[in-house]
A protein has these predicted regions:
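Hot-dog-fold acyl-thioester-processing enzymes
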Residues: 1-81, 143
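HotDog/MaoC-like acyl-thioester-processing domains
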Residues: 1-9, 86, 90-144
């Protein structure tokens, strides 16, 4: 486990990778976001998306899955908030890489046992653009 003191600002960390299949995208959409461009390749081609793509909810879930597999975890006490963007669609069978960049940190004024960390996390498609980015602030335990 890593603590607040272990967070290195400005050091980009590759957290992990995942490749969503066509079946995975359709299965998720069928249950959680049944839009034609997530379910049917022909309908997707004729849509504003220009082809089958993962739901934004699925894209975020992929980032959470990759993050859950990371080898070094922070002692996170709470999520304080986030801003999320989905600038490009996630396509089937394209590898995605989750990358985190800690931007700032400070000791909490009201709770000296924790610190506040703000980071930018992006999900990058193989050989292409970011398909999601988010800035998050969370409480991280300080070393005992």
């Amino acid at each position: 486990m890593h603590y607040f003191e272990d967070v290195v600002l400005g050091e980009e960390i590759e957290i992990g990778r995942h490749t969503p299949s066509r079946d995975e995208i359709v299965e998720f959409a069928r249950k959680w976001d049944p839009q034609p461009f997530h379910l049917d390749e022909e309908a997707a081609r004729d849509s504003v998306m220009g082809g089958l793509c993962a739901s934004s909810c699925h894209t975020y879930a992929i980032s959470a899955l990759i993050n859950s597999r990371r080898s070094t975890r922070l002692k996170t006490a709470a999520m304080l908030g986030m801003e999320v963007r989905f600038p490009h669609p996630v396509r089937p069978d394209v590898e995605l890489t989750l990358i985190e960049l800690p931007l700032e940190k400070r000791v909490s004024k009201s709770r000296p046992g924790v610190g506040v960390v703000r980071s930018r996390t992006r999900l990058q498609s193989e050989g292409g653009p970011d398909v999601m980015w988010m800035e998050t602030s969370f409480l991280v335990e300080r070393r005992p």
